[in-house]
């Protein structure tokens, strides 16, 4: 109870999602219908899908601007909130800064109440960049 009283917006979200869940689906961040497995899983479905939707928007922007700027890159993996890319050394810093900017822009696109932030790392192995 104390947790919820300290986070009134979260408590409101939980109540709203629980109400929607009775119909077997909830609305995602972008308005799409998300079928839920159970009412118990509804809040998790909303939160997990929001992360995926924001990340997809960030990747759309990243691809658009990286092509526009003629950067030499390939996106090789998207794992939850992380993107792994192969980028020519000459473009690595610019691509990294662009990726962070695109994540921030994705949050603005969906009018999130808290700003999104990100970071990038440059390396030759996954271990160095994770």
PLM-predicted stretches and their roles:
Residues 1-130:
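Conserved catalytic core of nucleotide polymerization and phosphodiester-bond processing enzymes
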